[in-house]
């Protein structure tokens, strides 16, 4: 019996495992940032067309942004006097002229042939050749960001006077248009406006928009905190919709995209903008506390849940946008709870660059457009992967320009963040990272009172990326006909699944983040099924996770089977080893059954990581077996699952089970 898993998923895991220890180090200086940018540039170089004078990224709306992002890299390289592949003044001159001379820059409104297009003029379209291509805020903003850097580097690049004048005109005319001027706003995405106002000030020397319009945007944003944030400061993508809208469950990517306005805050203050003060300043510090603790993991990857589901989840190009919040926070400690948070932000950025660098090294090219083999809607092609690489390369250049190569860096301690209204707990430590999402509001398949995913300290999948049923952690109770009466890992029904924070103890207060460093975090939840209920408790420490389940009949009759599941990742490459109390080891076969009595521990060996299950407690007669879960969209690389049968038959009324999980323990890795 074999478990099939997409080859790409296994290769991705092996690539990360082999490359990460050397690549994902923190504390980058300018030399490290340039080394990364040079390597990314070499991978993107084949896209350059000498005839056309542009990078051909593959169409689909990404070409103007990709070209502007690489213009940004070339411009910072010139500004800093860098010598290496990232420096190419001739290409920069050609790109700067091309981006303001005809498509993508337009001065007449494109024909409204695309229903979702944000039509306006002047502005930029999403094609280097079609003046009627779709428009969106991000197309303007990313192109303008690159042009602003080129303008700053105009002397080092020896830009022709005509190109400089056209950059100044295009940026200024666009920023002054109704599409961008106050009170214009797209949802609550103030970051794009901050970028445009800052670019206008850069190319014109006139900071009116930066002083006035950005100040008004920030005031409106923080005055609308009830619409922009849920309890615990989780982000709401649709501020004018119900908090229970599926897209408002949270959005790690958009929260950080909006938070990237911090890149321009210091420039605005120097230009005379009034500082955030009073309630807005307090909210800002709570938001950054929640964002760093709740949206990022120690390897520098997102602790990712998204109300937009497969439209955004694990998309590489969104990582490149989200990282800009880390650049801004690392460079603007005055907006954070304290200076150490800025040092942590830099560490997360640096490790994230290292993580991506390792993927690129092992793949021998540009990493995939979507990580961990999950599906995407719409399907993300190679052009999306190239845009992601350009964005992440540009972040290294932005970090250099922001002075992060000389800024302090520190590894964060174990961090947690809790959102009371949806029962989301995010946990990240140097050893592992995970999350519990009690209520998913229908945004994605996974969720419930259990670990929604489990990664090790290198962002290797240890157990799951978002499984359900037997591919998830948690308890399941079925009747004699196989009908499911209860599953603790089911996030669809908020009324029957509640999660509360036991330690540390907080009162639920709007405008406050329940987040920060920890040594001991505990949550408890209760799930009601059909005639059965469950009480679940989890304790998180920097090194381990301790879980307890108490299952009770509440009216269900006849024979019932209760199990607790521990999943793996990697298809047939994953395995499970049982160790008895005498130290004898046995690799379990699919379908085999084993008494739990006499076992000391289980080692769940996923493709690139591992975890140990020990301190097992279960009713007498409990058994375990290895089963093959079905393939799932949110967990495509599922390996075999350890299923512990803790109660069966018609006579049991309650069953109590406990276990400890230690991720990536040294003895496991020594044996692999």
Describe each PLM feature range:
Residues 1-5:
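N-terminal secretory signal peptides that target proteins for export/translocation
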Residues 20-26:
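Sec/Tat signal peptide C-region and signal peptidase I cleavage site
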Residues 8-19:
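Bacterial N-terminal signal peptides
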Residues 51-67, 107-119, 128-136, 144-149, ...:
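Extracellular polysaccharide-recognition and catalytic grooves
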Residues 275-279, 292-575, 580-611, 618:
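Extended polysaccharide-engagement surfaces of secreted carbohydrate-active enzymes
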Residues 26-124, 168-172:
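Low-complexity, Ser/Thr/Pro/Gly-enriched N-terminal "stalk/linker" regions
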Residues 595-672:
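Beta-strand-rich recognition/accessory modules
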Residues 81-93, 154-165, 272-280, 337:
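HEAT/armadillo-like alpha-solenoid scaffolds in large eukaryotic assembly and transport factors
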């Amino acid at each position: 019996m074999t478990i099939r898993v997409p080859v790409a998923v296994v290769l991705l895991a092996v690539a990360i495992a082999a490359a990460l220890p050397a690549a994902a180090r923190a504390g980058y200086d300018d030399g490290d940032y340039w080394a990364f940018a040079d390597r990314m540039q070499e991978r993107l170089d084949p896209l350059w067309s000498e005839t056309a004078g542009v990078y051909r990224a593959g169409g689909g709306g990404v070409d103007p942004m990709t070209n502007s992002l690489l213009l940004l890299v070339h411009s910072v390289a010139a500004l800093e006097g860098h010598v290496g592949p990232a420096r190419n003044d001739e290409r920069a001159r050609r790109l700067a002229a091309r981006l303001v001379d005809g498509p993508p820059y337009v001065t007449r409104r494109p024909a409204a042939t695309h229903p979702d297009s944000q039509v306006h003029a002047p502005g930029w379209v999403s094609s280097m050749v079609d003046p009627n291509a779709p428009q969106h805020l991000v197309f303007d903003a990313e192109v303008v960001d690159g042009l602003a850097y080129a303008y700053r580097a105009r002397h080092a690049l020896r830009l022709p006077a005509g190109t400089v004048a056209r950059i100044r005109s295009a940026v200024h005319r666009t920023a002054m248009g109704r599409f961008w001027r106050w009170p214009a706003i797209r949802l609550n995405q103030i970051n794009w406006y901050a970028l445009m106002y800052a670019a206008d000030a850069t190319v014109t020397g006139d900071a009116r928009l930066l002083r006035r319009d950005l100040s008004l945007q920030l005031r409106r944003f923080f005055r609308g905190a009830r619409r922009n944030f849920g309890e615990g400061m989780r982000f709401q993508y649709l501020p004018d919709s119900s908090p229970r809208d599926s897209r408002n469950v949270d959005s790690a990517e958009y929260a950080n995209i909006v938070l990237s306005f911090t890149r321009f805050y210091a420039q605005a203050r120097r230009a005379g903008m009034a500082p955030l003060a009073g309630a807005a300043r307090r909210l800002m510090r709570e938001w950054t506390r929640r964002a760093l603790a709740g949206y990022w993991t120690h390897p520098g990857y997102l602790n990712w849940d998204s109300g937009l589901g497969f439209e955004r989840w694990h998309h590489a190009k969104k990582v490149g946008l989200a990282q800009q919040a880390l650049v801004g926070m690392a460079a603007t400690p005055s907006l954070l709870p304290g200076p150490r948070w800025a040092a942590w932000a830099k560490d997360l950025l640096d490790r994230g660059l290292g993580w991506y660098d390792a993927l690129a090294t092992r793949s021998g090219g540009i990493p995939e457009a979507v990580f961990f083999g999950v599906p995407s809607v719409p399907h993300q092609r190679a052009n999306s992967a190239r845009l992601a690489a350009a964005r992440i390369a540009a972040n290294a250049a932005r970090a250099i320009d922001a002075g992060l190569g000389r800024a302090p860096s520190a590894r964060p301690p174990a961090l947690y963040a809790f959102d009371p209204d949806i029962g989301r707990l995010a946990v990240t430590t140097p050893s592992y990272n995970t999350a519990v999402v009690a209520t998913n509001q229908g945004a994605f398949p996974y969720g419930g009172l259990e670990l929604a995913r489990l990664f090790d300290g290198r962002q290797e999948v240890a157990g799951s990326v978002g499984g359900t049923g037997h591919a998830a952690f948690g308890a399941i109770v079925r009747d004699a006909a196989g009908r499911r009466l209860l599953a603790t890992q089911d996030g669809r029904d908020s009324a029957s699944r509640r999660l509360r924070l036991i330690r540390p103890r907080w009162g639920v207060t709007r405008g406050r983040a329940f987040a920060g460093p920890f040594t001991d975090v505990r949550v408890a939840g209760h799930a009601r099924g059909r005639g059965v209920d469950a009480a679940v408790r989890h304790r998180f420490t920097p090194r381990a996770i301790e879980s307890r389940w108490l299952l009770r009949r509440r009216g269900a009759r006849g024979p019932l089977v209760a199990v607790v599941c521990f999943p793996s990742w990697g298809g047939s490459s994953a395995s499970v080893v049982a160790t008895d109390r005498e130290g004898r080891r046995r690799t379990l076969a699919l379908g085999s059954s084993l008494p739990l009595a006499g076992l000391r521990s289980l080692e769940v060996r996923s493709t690139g990581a591992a975890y140990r299950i020990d301190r097992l407690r279960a009713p007498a007669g409990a058994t375990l077996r290895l089963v093959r879960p079905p393939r799932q969209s949110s967990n495509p690389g599922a390996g075999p699952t350890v299923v512990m049968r803790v109660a069966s038959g018609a006579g049991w009324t309650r069953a109590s089970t406990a276990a400890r999980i230690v991720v990536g323990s040294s003895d496991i890795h020594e044996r692999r």
